[in-house]
């Protein structure tokens, strides 16, 4: 994709006599008079945009500048949104943390995970606490278990200086399960078994006439 600065010259703002012209499909048209290039742009209902003013002669391109700027702005917006969603947040815990503080901090982690961010959970050790890394691991396990419904650890905890770190990543949304195809009530599926034939009706009993 071509990158065009917002302050580049367009159409009548271009004052040079000749330009090297690129067509709307990226084809090289060559060096032509600027007036002719502008006429070509008008005939195609496009704009003449100077994309490389430092070249000799300057390079111009035929394009719909308004549409191009809109697409550029949308791309920039999407890139900013993607960058924000990929940002790694950070929440710090102490080894000696009370239940209320733990609940508050895991609530922050949960919110970040729900927003699509990864979160670096850090356990900060003080003094002799560093000689008991199992205390930090215990808190990280508790964090992971508390947030198991929205995230999961990426790899194992790692020590860096006086801190123990663990990355929590948001869980991917679960794909919907496919339900079994509904069948009409009473439909037992395809069967080749024929229904049994009805039994023949019994002949009616007759009483014998008494002999004379």
UniProtKB/Swiss-Prot annotation:
SUPFAM superfamilies: Translation initiation factor IF3, C-terminal domain, Translation initiation factor IF3, N-terminal domain. One of its GO terms (molecular function) is ribosome binding. Pfam families: IF3_C, IF3_N. Keywords: Cytoplasm, Initiation factor, Protein biosynthesis. One of its GO terms (cellular component) is cytosol. Residues 194-212 have a biased composition (Low complexity). Transmembrane segments: none annotated. Its main location: cytoplasm. It is found in: Cytoplasm. PROSITE patterns: IF3. It comes from the Bacteria. Monomer. Belongs to the IF-3 family. NCBIfam families: infC (TIGR00168). HAMAP family: IF_3 (MF_00080). This is Translation initiation factor IF-3. It comes from Deinococcus radiodurans (strain ATCC 13939 / DSM 20539 / JCM 16871 / CCUG 27074 / LMG 4051 / NBRC 15346 / NCIMB 9279 / VKM B-1422 / R1).
